Amino acid sequence: MSRAALAFLLCCVLPAGTGSGALAADKPSLRILVVENAPPMSFRDETGHLTGFSVEIARAICSEMRVSCVFDAVKQGELLPLMSQGKADIAAAGLLETPERRSRILFAGPYYRSISLWVARAGVSPGQAGVRVAVVGGSAQEAYGQKQGWPTVAVATHGELAAPLISGEAQAVLVPMITAINLQKNRAFRQLDLVTTVFQAPELSGDASFGISPYRPELQKEINAALVRIKRNGTYDRINSRFLPFRVS
């Protein structure tokens, strides 16, 4: 993650012949899960079409692999159970490799670097008495807060994170850095004059990867090779520029 990327948030709290051509007729469709209402990573546009950074990276990977992919949007907390049960092939979401997740699913190579941010009123610190922290249910941030014994306010989707702070139900929010981009688009949230700081915890920063069904280990090599190709041929950078105001790889 570049310094320019961090500064942005703290201030505003295929080559020819590769991956082109017809899809392979002998390959069944892959079921890909994305997170519902998690802009700018995955969301529905004005026509109801699923899009976003993670969604379009997944589509590019499918194209490189020459397979047909079917996308389903689910809540963050549903990703791990569905993947571990083999009910989907790929989770196209920025998942940090926590011990619990590694015991249940496989991971592709990283597609971006992630850090977490603590957003709260000045003087409000993690673990402070009386502070309730907004998190997304099923996220690494929720698991961390519960481990610390913090009172948390869990919401179903990233797009709902602003509401607990605006209403006063929560006094802080712990979020992935990229999620903070969308929070800052909410006028009522901006008017709270909250302070954004990088949250220093090894469990909440590092490489973010797609999840892979434990029943489809052969996909790991294919996905990783496709990811390398879209980074080399410029597709990755074009998607990055379309959805994010800074480089994440």
Model-found features: residue ranges?
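Periplasmic-binding protein-like
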Residues: 35-37, 112-117, 185-228, 244-249
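Bacterial N-terminal signal peptides
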Residues: 5-17
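Short helix-initiation/N-cap motifs at beta->coil->alpha
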Residues: 38, 55, 70-81, 138, ...
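Short glycine-rich His-centered loop
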Residues: 27-53
